[in-house]
Amino acid sequence: MSDANQTKLEAADIQDLLAVLPHRYPFLLIDRIVDIDGDVSATGIKNVTINEPHFTGHFPEKPIMPGVLIVEAMAQTAGAISLLQRKTGRPGVVYFMTIDNAKFRRPVIPGDRLLLHVKKIKQRANISKYECIAEVDGVKVAEAEVAAMISTAEESQ
């Protein structure tokens, strides 16, 4: 996308995320995005709390954030920065396409602040692939590569 079609945004708060992502409670898995560099890289922030519904069953005696939700949070971060860079009036929809090389290194538990580092490694037409690393307190807890397709709102109907 050319600079003429992009906006410049360095951080996104929850209101910005709600404006571009279709996800809502309990499936909006990022609270904020910082260090945004166009649609190339950024860091999502997820504050993990015991109040999240998945902890009632995963696992009641030792709550651990499911790995699939960590990957989803990575994908939401990548999708959000792609959509946030589009000019106002050009809404889009992100479709999660693939997950590759997912690895889970350490459990994520309530009270953790999950940092989701995403970096675009490939783009072809409207499909982007991102390298993602999740960290807690500077320690890598998970990693994956995710790909998504961005379409305009008109194309998705």
Swiss-Prot record:
Function, as annotated: Involved in unsaturated fatty acids biosynthesis. Catalyzes the dehydration of short chain beta-hydroxyacyl-ACPs and long chain saturated and unsaturated beta-hydroxyacyl-ACPs.
Lineage: Bacteria, Pseudomonadati, Pseudomonadota, Alphaproteobacteria, Hyphomicrobiales
Transmembrane segments: none
Class in the EC hierarchy, top level: lyase
PANTHER family: 3-HYDROXYACYL-[ACYL-CARRIER-PROTEIN] DEHYDRATASE (PTHR30272:SF1)
Protein name per UniProt: 3-hydroxyacyl-[acyl-carrier-protein] dehydratase FabZ
Keyword Chloroplast: no
Signal peptide (UniProt feature, chain positions): none
Top-level taxon in the UniProt lineage: Bacteria
Major place of residence: cytoplasm
Documented EC number(s): 4.2.1.59
